[in-house]
Structure formats: C-alpha cells, structure tokens
Amino acid sequence: MPPGTKGDPSNVTQPLPCLPSAEEDAIKVFVRIRPPVEGTLTGVDGEQGSCLTALSSTTIRLHSKPEPKMFTFDHVANVDTTQESVFSSVAKNIVESCMNGYNGTIFAYGQTGSGKTFTMLGPSESDNFTHNLRGVIPRSFEYLFFLINREKEKAGDGKSFLCKCSFIEIYNEQIFDLLDSASAGLFLREHIKKGVFVVGAVEQVVTSAAEAYQVLSMGWRNRRVASTSMNRESSRSHAVFTVTIESMEKTNDIVNIRSSQLNLVDLAGSERQKDTQTEGVRLKEAGSINRSLSCLGQVITALVDVANGRQRHICYRDSKLTFLLRDSLGGNAKTFIIANVHPGSKCFGETLSTLQFAQRAKLIKNKAVVNEDTQGNVSQLQAEVKKLKEQLSQLLSGQMPGDISVARAPSVGDNMDYMNTFIEAMMLLERSDSEKKALLQKVIQLEDLCNKKEKFIQSNKMIVKFREDHIVRLEKAHREGQISLSNNEQDNFIAELKEEIRTLKEQVEHHPRVAKYALENHSLREENKRIGSLQSVKRAQEVSAQMMAELEKAFLEASVSEKDRQVAPMHSTPIQLDNSSLMSAARMRERMLQLESELATSKQEYEEFKELTKKKQVEQESELQSLMKSNQHLENILDAIKENKRHEVSQLNRMHAETIKNMTTPTKAYNLRSRLVPRLSLDGISNGLTDTPKSGDVMDDIINEPIPPEMSEQAYEAIAEELRIVQEQVTALQVKLDEEESKNIKLEQQVNKLELCSTQIQELFNSERSNWNKEQQAFIAQIKSLEKQQQDNKNQEDVLKSEVHDLRVVLQSADRELSAVKGEYSLFREKQEKELSQLSARHMAVQLQLDNFRLEHETLLEEKRSLQDAFDNLEEVMKFETDQLKQELSDSKHENETLRAELSNLLELLETEKERRQKLTSQLEEDKESKTKELLQVVDENMHLRKQCSELVTKCEHQVTELQRLEHSLTSSKEMIADLEKKNTADKEVVVDLMNQIQVHRTTIIHKTESIDLLTRELEDINSKYSIVLLAKEECKTVNEEQEKQIEELRESLERKQSADNIEKELLCDDLAHATEELGKLTEAFNKQETMLHACEKELVEKEQLISELTNKVKLMTDLEITKTEQEKIKPSHSNSNSPVVLAQTPRTPVGNPYESEFANLQNRNTNLAVLISELNEERTLKNEEIIKLKMQLCETENMHLEIQNLQGICKELKSQLENCKKGMKDGNEQKPSDMQDLKREIEKEVSERMEKGKATEHILKLQAELEETRNLLCAKDHSLNELNNEMERTRSLEAKAFTEKEQIRSVLEAKYEETEKLSQELDMLRKQVSFLAEENGKILGHQNPNQKIQYLVKLKKENDKLLEEAEKLRIENLFLKETKKCEHCD
C-alpha cells in the first residue's frame, strides 16, 4: 500500500518511551498523526495547512479558535514515527502479558483514510509480512512466537504451547468468517467461562509466525474493501483477528494451564458523505459503520460515567462490535487503542471527535486477571490440600513453628512466603465470613425485634383506645342511669373483649422483652447443644430429664385433679363466656409465668454448664498429672532396662570367655596325648646330667607342634553356634519383655484412668445428689406457693364474677350507643376511603406525568449535549474553514501578483522579439543580393520565429483572458474581503504564527537534509557495529552452549560422585563399627588372658617350694638352657616389635583418586573457575595427606613405645618364670613341660593379639583419614557447585541483557529500514519535482539563447549525475540492509 492511501510513517531512530500509567489496567491510548500525502507536497510553498501539532510524546495541540485545545494521552506519535516504535510502544507489553495469561486487545480507531490499516497491517504489497513497513499485527506474530520458542528452550519438555487463530469481519451488522469464504452469517453467544464468542468460527492451529501470516493473508483477501474519494482502498467492515494462546506446565503430576486471547482489531473509519461522495451500496455501508462506531462511543461514555460513580445501563448489545469487545472495553483484558488522526484542515471535525473519543476511552479502567486452571493427579492434589489444611490448623491453634522458613532451603523461601500469605488470606476469609454471618444474623434479629416493638406499640394503642371507648360508654351509661343491657349490646361487648384479649395475646407474643429473651434463649440453646455433646453432660441431662418427666407427670396429675374439683356444669350464658375469657387470661398469665420459669431454668443450666466446665478442667488436669506420672514411670523402666541390658551383656561376655576356655582345653589335651613323654624314674634322675640335651629337644618339638585345623574349625563352629543360640534367646526375651512392659504400661494407665474416673464420678454424683435435693425442696415450696396462689385466684375470680355481672348490665346500655356511633363511623369511613382513592388516582397520574417529564427532560438534556457538541464542532470547523479561505485569498492575491509579473515579462519579451524581427528584416533587405543562401536560412528562421510569435500571441491572449478572469475573481474576492476585514484583524496574529511556523519548517527541512547525510553515515557505522555484535552474539551463543553442556556434565558427574561417596561412606561406617566391635572383643580377651596369667602365677608360687629343692641339681643344665631360650625369645620379640612399623609404612591407597581424576577431566572442560578450584583442591588434599601421615606416624611411634615397654616387662616376667620352671624341672614333675608350653602359647597368643590390635588401630586410622579426604572432597565439590551455580546465574543475566540489547538493535535496524524506504520515496518525489520544475522553467524561459540552453543542459546533466550517484548509494545501502535482515532471520 503506498503511503498516500492509508498513512505513511517516517523515520525516527528510537522508539517512544513507555510511561507508567497510574492504573495498571486502565485503557491506554496511542495517538498517531498521519503524514501528508504526495499530492499536498506540490503546493505553492511545499506545505499544507495542518490543524494539529504534537508538542511532546504525551501532548497534542489542536489549532481551534479562539484558543487552541490541548489533549494529553499515554503516547503521541508525530508524522516521523516509525512502525517499529509503534509496535514497541503498543503491542510489545500486550503480547508479553498474553504470554503470562492475561487477555489483550489492540484496535485502531479513526476516520477513513487516517492510516488505521497501514498501522495494523502495513503496506498493501504482497510481501507486506517481510516488508520494512509491516504493521503491528505481523510484528506481534513474530514477537509472540519468539517468546514461545524462548520459553520452550528454557523449560524443555515441561512446558508446551498451543496457538489457534480465527479471523472474522462485521459487515453491515452481520458477522462473516474470513477463513471460510462459503460461510453464511454467524451468531454471537455468551459462555460462563469463554465469555462472548462467535459460533461456528473456524480456528486454525498455528505453530510459527509464517503460518499465522498465511492465515492472516488468506482472510485478508476475503475482506471487503472499496475505493472512495478519500481513500483508494477503504475498509468497509470491522476486522477482528483473534489469537488464542494456551500453555500447559507440568510440575510433580500437577498441570497448570494458562489461556489467553489476543484480539487485533482493524475498525472501519467513520465517514461523511460530503467528503467521501459515496452513494448506493457504499452509502449503506458507511451508515452501518457510523452506527456501530456511535454505539462504541455511547458504550465508552457509559463506562466513564460508571467509573465516576453514576448508575448507567451499558448498551453492549446495541451493536455486534461492542458485544464482541465487551471484555476488552470494560472487563477482563488489557486494552490499547491506537487513535489515527488526519492533520489536514479538511478533516478538522473528524479529528476533533476522534481526539474526544480517545480522551473519554482513557478514563475506563479494566480488571484483568490471569486465566489459570490447575489439574493433575487426584492423590497429589489431595496430599497438597491435606498439607495446607494441617498447616492451617496448626496456625489456628498457635502451634505453627516459627522457624519454618529457616529450616527450609533458600529456594523454598518464596513458596513458604506464598504459603504463609495463602494461609493468612484463608484465615482472613474464614474470619470475615464468620463475622459477616454473625452480623447478618444479628441484623435479622434486630429487625425482628424492631418489628415486634412496632407491633407492641400498635397493640398498646389499640388497648388504650378500647379502654378509653369502654370508659366513655360506662360514664355515659352511668349518667343516663341505664342498668340493663340488651343481647346485641352484650354480644358487641363480648366481641370487643375478645378483640382486646387477642391484642393482648399478640402483645405478649410480640413483646420486645420476650423477643430479647428469645434471642438469649437461642444463644443459650446453642451453647447448651455444644455442652450437651460432652458425655458427662449427657448423663446429667438424662438424669435431669427423668426427674423432669416425673415432676411434670406429678404436676399434670395435680392440675387434672384440681380441674375435676372445680368443674361445674356449663351453660351458654354471658357469665360463662366471661368465665372462659377470664380463664384464657389466666392461661396467658400462666404462660408468662412458665416462660419466666423457663428463662430461670435456662440461666440455672448455664450456671451448671460453668460448673461442669470447671469439673472438666479439673479432670483434664488430673489426667495430665497421671500421664506425667506414667511418663516418669516409663523413664524409670527404661533406665532399668538399660541397666539390665548392661548386666546381660556382661554375662554374655563371661559366657563367651568360658566357652573359649572350654574350647581351647581339648587342644592342650590333644597335644599332651599326641606326644611321647619320657618316663621319669630314679635312674633317670640320677642320669639326668647326661640326658638333658635330648629332653630339651623333645620339649622344643612339643612346643613347636601346630594345632590341627579340624580342632580350630570345631572350636569356631561351637563358638558361633553358641553365640547364635544366645542371640536368639536374647531377642526372644527382649520381645517378650517389651510386650510385657507395654501391657503393663497400658494396664497401669487404665487403672489410673479408672481410679480418676471413679473419684470424679463419685464427686459428681454427690454434688448432683445435693443439687437435686435442693431442687426438690424448691419444687415442693413452689407447689405450695402455687396452691396458695390458686386459692387467691379463686377468691379474686368470685369478686370479678360479681363485678362482671354488674358491668354487663352497664354494657348493654353502652352497646346501643356504640352501634349508633359505629354507623356514623362507617359512613365517615366510606367517604374518607372514596376521597383517598380519588387522591391516590390523582397522585398516580401526577407521578406518571412527572416520570414522563423526567424522561423527556433527560432525553432533551442528552440531545442538547449532543447538539452542543455538534455545534461546537461545527463552529470550530467554520472558524477553521474561514481561516483557510483567508489563506486561500492571500494565496490567490500572491498568485495574481506573480501572474501580473509574468505578463509584464512576456510583454517585454514580445517587444524584444519585435525589435529583433525589425533588425533582421533590415539586415535581410541590405544583404538581399549578396547573400541568397543566408536569406533562405533567415526566411526559415523567420518562419520559425513567426510560429513562435504566433504561439506567444496565443499565449498572450490566453493570459489576457486569464487575467480578465482573475480580475473578475479579484473583484469578487474584494467583496469577500470587505466582509471578512473585521475578522481579519483578530486573525492576523495567527497568520503571523503560521508564517513563523512555515519559516521554522523550512529551516527544519534544511536541517533534515543535513541530518539525512549524518544518518546515512551513522547507518554505515551502525551496520558495522551490528555485524560486530552479531559475531559477538554468535560467540556468546557458542560459549553459552558449551557452558550449559559443561554444567550438565558437571551435574551428572556430581550426582554420580555423591551417590558413590554415600555408598563408600556407608561401607566405611560399617567397617568402622565392625572394627570397634572387634577391638572390644580383643580387649575382653586380653583381660581374660591376664586373669589366667595371674592364676598361673599363683600355681607357680605354690610349686616354688618343690622347685627350690631341685635347684642345686640342675644348675649347669639351667644355665645352658637360659642362654638358648634368651636367644630364641629375643628373635621373635624383635620380629614382633618390628612388624607394626613395617605395617605402618605400607603404602596407602586413598579413596579419592578416581574422584580426583574425574574432577581433573571436569577441570579441563571448565575455563577459568575450574583451574582455581583444582589448584585449591590439590593444595588442600596435599596438606590433609601430610597432616594425616604425621598423625599416623605419631600414633605409630606412641604405640611402638608402649608395645616395646610392655614387651620388655613381659620378657622380664617370662625370663623369671622360665628360670623358675627350669629349676622345677629337676624334680621330674610331668606337668612342667606342659605348663611351659602353655605359657609359651599364651605369650604367643598375647603377642599376636597385640599385633592384630595394632593392625586394627592402623586400619581405623586409615579409615578416618579416608573419611577426612572424602569430606574435604565433598566440601570442595559443594564449593565448586556453588560457584557453578553463580556462574549459571551470571550467564542467565548476561543472556537477558543480550536479549534486551538484541531487541534494541533490532528496533534500531527496523527504524533504519523504514528510513531507507522513506528516503527512496522522497528521492522519487524529488525527482518528479525536479523534472516538473525543469519543464516549467523551460517553458517560462523559452531558452532565448543557445548558449544559455547549453549551460542549462550541462547543469541539468550534472544534477542528474549527482542524483544518480545518490540513488545508487541508497540502492546499495538498501541491498546491504536486506541482506543483514535475511541473515538475522536465518539466525
């Protein structure tokens, strides 16, 4: 579409600023001024009269008379605004809010030809979706699907989107589907969830901006467009393009669904038949367009009145357009209106009405909400609801933990804040609902109380009236001396008494005290119901109900017996009627007394309830004490169980030691039986000196003989079997013990409860018995008082009977007078009713007339208001048109002067031509004979000149006629000037302002030409910068992708490492526990062996006496054997003492080596942070290893010193023991070799146990070191993970920053594209102007001289070459920009 048809944007480098509005959901207004068309640029001075100017980005001034009008909007775009700035100011925020679940609407409003379709769609070319001047709708598609793709990249498979498009038009108040060309008229329907929708409209699913473009172009081809005098392609219908966006997000089996609608509306423009010159079908279309737009204006006016607090009916259903856009205008949507205005003076009235419409629409406030629904697994949702209920109950009971936010991780803080706010909101809602219900109930009760008070007052008035009438009648009868009454009078009197009794009953029923008591009774009953739910109260109520039933039965029997005594034969006499009325009054009194007694009982019940609550409190306190006692008892039992377990463990250890001892004794017997021992006799003793070496060898063989493996396996199996049996017995006993203890605890609790219940029941029973005795005595006293009262009532009844008999006689006379007065009263009442009916009829008629007058007055006021607006508009238009006529008059004067100057010039030229002709003719006559050839040429030239002269003569004639016509028009204009001279004085200042503005515009044109050059240079710089930014962006993308991959790999490796570390940690803990158990066992075994060694020492002391006798005989043999045994013992002791050192210096394999290798691989992938982390981790691990090694060495040295000391002490003891044993061997005792062998074995066993203990300690130290290493590794991994998370956050912020910079650069590029388009258009227009001016100049000048013509042609050629060079530059720049744009789209 060319700029001249629907509006033309111009260049601006930056988008308009988005100002924050006071109300977030108020309708925002964007005003755009349409640029002038091409035809207006070829005026007299290159300018056209503009009726408005944009003062700033938010204010606009309309040049009206006598004073200009100022309008303020959210955004005001001048003539130079680009399509990109319009999109960034209007549609960008709306599209983002639609992504967040809000409904959004954008529609363009304005007169026909003001640029609505150009703003919404763009130019009418076929490639307008990729055109640089494309409108709001295509750009909205691009941005929407860009945001969708971005969200998908962020969320992955957890979030999905569905976009559906529909396209309809409203033509002549009928709805048609543009996506289905064969569809008939569609209908609007309303749904409780969807709102207003079109039945049967086609919805196409789209997945990209290109598909949305196809849907839009397919529907746009079906739209009704026609040509008018103001617009070559005028929209003849309202078009509504709707995009439905649905997003589904899954988190832990819960699905959050958000849905929103984006309505993009292109309204048809308002038209005037005088301006557009429409007729026939076009006129009908214009009428329906104007009607729907007027309905839109009425709806907006009504919404503004409602916002200001007035009660107005909003007529949405008067037009299909307003009904369809109901939510957008005053409901659940965020709305932006683009008001397009025409700056031309001819469109002043429509421009003014458009600005007033936009100003009213700006005052409307919508209430946009997020359209969100939650679905998912029922169990998950139920668990969430249960969790929320538990938290709510805890918060209500005051048991909610205060540090719940501290215990959570920092990432859960937002959820906890949300949960706390949600709980507070729920509590506030419940509290407000309960308060509201209580207040409503109180209001109802108070209204009932007021009604009852009114009825009570009315009944009192009636009673007073009856009594006054009765007194008057009695006084009259007393004065007249009437004693007897007729039957009619008696009947009337009885009827009046009955009426009085009825009013008394009503008074009793509607008495305010009774109502108050009823309210108190109601509240007490509710309290009683709550109390009655308790078991103790239920029991008490049952007992009281039984007692009450018995008392009521006794009272009824007593009352029946009284009635039987007092019943007399009934006769239908006036006295009996009187008796019945008196009885009814007595019954009412009894009822009153009964109500008062019920009130007293209810109060008494309330006191009893207080006592019961106190008892319940005492009961609970006693229960609490019993529970505390039971808790103390359980703690004592637990301590006893622990002590018992310790005792059992010690017993098991003893049993284990005994079993080991028993199992090891057969090995000794086996060793003793398996070897031949030389028999000792007297000969052997005598020959001992010679046989000692052989016996020593035998002893060595016996000692060095190994134990057979079968015996050790049997010993181990026996120990394991015994341990298993003991463990099974222990577990069974423990289970039984637990069961018995739990049973015992339950029984003790039951016993305590039963004791407490029995004591409380006994106390309650005693108190209730005393209460019932008191109540029984009170009832007996009440019965006695009632009997006395009954007797008094009988006496009073007798007196009243006599009085009634006397009064009846008086009443018979009074009834006659009453009947006469009633007749008079009935006549008076009939007259009064007739008058009242007449007055009411008159009142209704007057009221109807008043209503009609009010309606007429309102309609007249509305008509007056509309006429006033129309009058103001017409007045403004008339003033503006007069200004335009004055301007045209001045222009015509100027043109007239120019024409006169041209005419004088032409006359001078004509005279010069005549002189030239005369000169030429004279020269021809002189040179006639000599220059025949030249004569012929001159003749030709003369003929040519004659033709030119004839042409000039014709031109002069035409100019003379035109001059006459202009003189005639001048005379008519002079007459008009005479009429307008008075007004001209007032408008001179405005003309001066306009001239100044023209001068300013001329200067701005010069500055703009200079700025165009600067902008072209800046464009080149920006292009170069943009290419650099694109390269940097690509590098950033690659770096981000690599970092994301590295982060994912690091996460996976960390998870693997954490799982492996956890498994190893568990294994190490198990090993450590096993090692500690083995160490305990070894210490126990060592203690047992020490006890055995002490026992052996005692035996040795007993046998020292025998050994001392044989010392003298075996001195030589003992010396030799001592030396041998010392050498043999020193060797194993040295080997034993050196073995821990060797073991301690064995190489250690750390657990963290595979993790360090993996971490090294991760460090190679990471760039900067990983190097630092690896260095720190290496230093830390080295230091930890050094510390652990030093600790191990210290422990080993200490252990070695201790073991050496122990071994030295043991060696000394063993040496002494061996010396003693060898001395005792001389006696020939058979037990000595076996004892020595046992001692050696015990020593070897003790040494091996010490070695195992050392190994176990070394193993424990190794495990501790490995644990420290794993802990350090975990700390390092946590630190690196935190750093990676920080790096992730930083990359995200950089990505967001890059996104915003990219959007800014894209908007700048779009503005540059539009600038190039505008520059090319202006270049074409300038070329046309140059050609036109060249033709006009050639015509005016006529090129008298060939040299002038040649110079002029050379000048034109140079200018043409310059223009061609500029055009070539601009074409190259345009191609470069298109290529960069294609590259950007490819990216």
Curated annotation (Swiss-Prot):
GO terms for cellular component: centrosome; cytoplasm; microtubule; spindle pole. Residues 1138-1387 are annotated as: Necessary for its targeting to microtubule minus ends. Keywords: ATP-binding, Coiled coil, Cytoplasm, Cytoskeleton, Microtubule, Motor protein, Nucleotide-binding. ATP binds at G110, Q111, T112, G113, S114, G115, K116, T117. Residues 369-1383 form a coiled coil. GO terms for molecular function: ATP binding; microtubule binding; plus-end-directed microtubule motor activity. Strongly expressed in testis and weakly in lung (at protein level). InterPro entries: HMMR_C, KIF15/KIN-12, Kinesin_motor_CS, Kinesin_motor_dom, Kinesin_motor_dom_sf, P-loop_NTPase. It is found in: Cytoplasm; Cytoplasm, Cytoskeleton, Microtubule organizing center, Centrosome; Cytoplasm, Cytoskeleton, Spindle; Cytoplasm, Cytoskeleton, Spindle pole. Gene3D superfamilies: Kinesin motor domain (3.40.850.10). GO terms for biological process: centrosome separation; microtubule-based movement; mitotic spindle assembly. It holds the Pfam family HMMR_C. Plus-end directed kinesin-like motor enzyme involved in mitotic spindle assembly. Required for centrosome separation and maintenance of spindle bipolarity during mitosis. Homodimer. Dimerization is required for targeting to microtubule minus ends. Found in a complex with tpx2 and microtubules. Its association with microtubules and targeting to microtubule minus ends requires tpx2. This is Kinesin-like protein KIF15-B.
